[in-house]
Structure formats: C-alpha cells, structure tokens
Design a protein with these regions (language model features):
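Transmembrane helix-loop junctions and nearby membrane-interface residues
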Residues: 102-109, 191-194, 224-230, 251-255, ...
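12-transmembrane solute porter fold
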Residues: 17-42, 53-62, 66, 73-75, ...
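Alpha-helical transmembrane segments of multipass membrane proteins
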Residues: 99-100, 165, 218, 222, ...
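Hydrophobic transmembrane-helix bundles of small-molecule transporters
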Residues: 168-278, 303, 446-447
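N-terminal membrane topogenic signal
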Residues: 12-19, 206-208
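Intrinsic disorder in cytosolic terminal tails and internal cytosolic loops
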Residues: 1-16, 458-481
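Helix-loop-helix hairpins in multi-pass membrane proteins, especially solute transporters
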Residues: 71-208
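Short loop-to-helix capping motifs
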Residues: 48, 52, 106, 171, ...
Length: 481
C-alpha cells in the first residue's frame, strides 16, 4: 500500500494528532521567521562584509526565490520518496544551512547558504502541511489548520523584535544560530511523531512541467522584487511578463501530459477553485498593508522608525488577539458569511486608513489597525481551512503544492502592488502639497481590490465547506464544479 493510500485510511479511522500539527507549525514558524528576520540585521551584515546595505538584499531575494521555486516539486517528492523522509530531510537541510549562514565569511557564501536554507524551507512547509492533512479527518480539519495558521500571523510580529534584539545584544550570526537547537529538537520530534509510509517508486518526474513551473515562479518572484526595489526600471516588468508566459506554458503542458508534475483537475473542485482565486487576492491585499503603513507614518506623518513600528504592531495585535475566536466564528456562521464579512470589513478599514493624517489621534489609529488585523486574521484562517474542505486524499499533494505556491506569490505580489499604487498616485507636485495624498490613493486602491475577493466569496455555495465548519465526517466528492 502506498503512503497516500495508508494515510487516507488513517485519516478516516482516527482522530487528528495535535502534537503532530504543533510540530509542523513550529517548523513553519522557523521558515516564516527566516524569511523576514534578516531585514533588521542588514546594516550589521553589510558592515562586516564591507558592502553597502542594498547589496545584502540579494540574500533575502535568493531565499524567497528558492522557497517559491522548490514548492511545486514538493508534492511529487513526497509521493515518490515518502513524506516522512522528505520532511525530516528538509528540517536537517534547513538546520545545517542555518549553521553555514552563521559561519559565512562573505556575501557570496551567505547567499549560497541562504539558497540551501530556502531549499529546506521549500520542502518543510508544503510537505509538513501534507503530513497533517493526510492524518486529519474532515471534521477536525478546522482545528488542525488553526494550528498551522498561527506561524504566519505571529512571525511578522516577532521578526523585527527577535532580529533587532539578537543583532543588538549578540550579533547577526545568532539570527541563524538560534535555528540549530530548534531544528535539532524538531528533527527528533519528527522522527517520533511523523508516521512511516512507503513512497510510490512508480511516480516518474515530469521534467518539462518542473522546468516550466519553477522557471515561471522564479521569474515572477524576481520580477516582483525588482519592481518593488526599482519601480522606474523595466527589468521587473519584463521578468514578471516572462514569468507569466512560462506559467501559461506550464499550464498548457500540465493539462496535456499523461504524467503531470501536479494535477490541475483540483480546480474542478469549486471550493478550491474559488478560494485559490479569491484567497490569492485576499492575501495579496493584506500583504500590501504592512508595506504601506510604515512608509505613510514616516514619509507622510513625519514619525521616526520606532514610532511607526510600534503603531504597525497594532495590526498584529489584532491578528493574535482574535485568533481564539476564529474557529468558533466559522463553526457558528459557516465559511461563506465569514469570508464575505472578513473581506468587506477589511476593505472598510483600508478605506478608513486613507482618511488618516498626522492630526488623527493616535489611539484612534491604533484601534483602527487592531480591527484591521483582526479581520485579516479571520479571513486568513477561513481561507486556510476551506481550500482543502472538498479535496479527496488522492488530490492532496497537487492541491497542497498549488496552494503553497500561490501563498508565496501573493506575499511578494502584495508588496509590489502596494509600491505600484504609490507610484501611480504620486503625481508631480502632489507630494509637496500633501505628503499623504499618494498613500490615500494607494489605500483606496487596495480597498477596491479587496472587494474582488468579496465578490469571489459571494459566489460560494451557502453550505460550502460545511463538513469542515460544522465538524461533520464524510468523504467529499472528487469534484464539485
């Protein structure tokens, strides 16, 4: 019996395992934290390596690009080798690469180590999710995803604090050294908690699909990074266009070949299709907010970085504060009403951000951002749960790889879109007259963009994901067009 078959049987015959979900969530936290924690250490790293701070950005781009490019092959690798082996190996690679990062003597070595670290991270997140999903009955999926969502909400809160504290009181090397005991503990726990399973050696790798998909995703990530860092230059737009072309070619290939890298028929499941499109827009818009807010507070209001950072933390206070209530809300009202409410309420808070200025009372700003963060958390949790509600066990590897890739792209696209809106609304002479004008336009634009997610949620059936939201057992149909 293959691993996917044995785990499907396990999910149907036993309750979910909170310790396994907590282990996977902990590895997610390491990966998410390392994606952003380096920002606060850039000046120190630049000083040690005798380079300008802008040069150090390549280490972040290399990491994010490797993660995004590695995710598409994760489903095939887990099926071929076995999810337990891949997950444990990913933790080992990530931990070893963290040590190499700390031992780096120059920027080239650090960048290479970050690529290796990204390769480990690319396998940890989707394969870890797959391990949990395969061992979780439908009626417990909402509880399981509640564990898996918190790293994405908590890591942005702690990353600046952890990075700043380690760099200030120790050195930037400890940003990576701290992963070693955590990684070793996670590796030992994985050996004990992750169930064994035989891989399917008959699964051949779709090399054409792999090359087209990874090249397309890589070009998109690089293009979004370039478009954000150098909006006046054409390289970002060219890279994004090339990435979209490669992704389109990959879709055509995956639909025609008999042995695709991942199955696109998962989009025949209505809940997965709707939450992939609406969820992408939702994650894109909420990713733009932490980018726009500190810029508005510093450039528009004239605040110092610390003042701005404390105020932005209000968003993440709302994220964490509402988290215990998200599961009861979904159980009480169902997915569709919760998604419609979260996206509409988020759009309203974005529009209200456009009304802020330097004279707005700070407690009022803080309260608005706490509310925005709470709505962000509700929608984030709901999308993470419903996307797998009607996916059958055999489709999980493909659905998981596609979803993880879209999440990674949405985060980068959100920052790029925020920067694009700022540029569009920065008319010559406007900034001098009203330094907040461009930010007002940008926040109104992302509010309108969020309404597209609302429209997508309205198209869902009233009982969409009911087996998950109501905690009912039962196997879903393979497709629900």
């Amino acid at each position: 019996m293959s691993e996917s078959q044995s785990n499907a049987a396990s999910a149907a015959s036993q309750k979910w395992q909170p310790r396994l979900a907590l282990l996977v969530a902990a590895t997610f936290f390491m990966e998410f934290l390392d994606g952003t924690v380096l920002t606060t250490a850039i000046p120190s790293i630049a000083g040690d390596f005798a380079v300008v701070p802008a040069d150090v950005n390549i280490t972040m781009t290399a990491y994010l690009m490797t993660v995004a490019m590695g995710i598409p092959v994760s489903g095939w690798l887990a099926e071929r080798v076995g999810a337990r082996k891949v997950f444990c190996a990913a933790i080992a690679v990530f931990t070893a690469a963290s040590l190499l990062c700390a031992l780096s003597q120059d920027l080239t070595m650090l960048t290479a180590a970050r690529v290796l670290q990204g390769a480990g991270g690319a396998m940890m997140v989707p394969v870890g999710t797959l391990v949990v999903l395969r061992r979780t009955p439908k009626e417990d999926l909402l509880r399981a995803t509640a564990y898996l969502v918190w790293p994405g909400l908590l890591a942005p809160v702690l990353a600046p604090l952890v990075g700043g504290a380690l760099t200030t009181f120790l050195s930037w090397h400890w940003i990576f050294l701290i992963n070693i005991p955590l990684g070793l503990a996670a590796f030992i726990a994985a050996l004990r908690l992750v169930p064994r399973g035989a891989g399917d050696q008959s699964r051949r790798l779709d090399w054409v699909g792999l090359l087209l998909t990874t090249a397309g995703v890589g070009a998109l990530v690089v293009g979004l990074e370039l478009a954000t860092a150098h909006p006046s230059e054409p390289f970002g737009a060219v890279s994004v266009a090339a990435g979209l072309g490669l992704v389109a070619a990959a879709v055509l290939w995956l639909r025609r070949t008999s042995n695709p890298l991942f199955e696109l028929n998962v989009f025949g499941t209505r809940t997965f299709r709707a939450t992939s499109t609406g969820g992408f827009i939702y994650r894109l818009t909420i990713s733009a907010v932490p980018f726009l807010l500190p810029l508005m507070f510093q450039d528009g209001f004239g605040w110092d970085p610390l003042h701005a950072g404390v105020m932005v933390a209000a968003v993440f206070v709302g994220n964490i504060g509402i988290k215990p209530a998200t599961t009861p809300l979904i159980r009480r009202f169902g997915f569709k009403p919760v998604l419609v409410f979260a996206s509409l309420a988020s759009a309203v808070t974005f529009a209200l951000c456009a009304l802020l200025d330097s004279g707005t009372p700070e407690p009022l700003i803080f309260a608005l951002l706490v509310c925005s963060g709470a709505f962000r958390s509700i929608g984030f949790s709901a999308y993470a749960s419903i996307q797998y509600a009607d996916i059958v066990p055999g489709q999980l590897p493909s659905a998981n790889a596609i979803s993880a890739t879209l999440v990674q792209l949405a985060a980068g696209a959100g920052i790029a879109v925020g920067a694009l809106f700022l540029r569009l609304f920065s008319a010559p002479g406007t900034f001098e007259a009203d330094p907040v004008a461009a930010y007002r336009g940008a926040f109104l634009a992302i509010a309108v963009l969020m309404l597209l997610s609302t429209a997508d949620s309205l198209a869902l059936h009233r009982q969409a994901g009911a087996d998950v939201s109501r905690g009912r057992s039962g196997a879903p149909k393979a497709a629900n067009p």
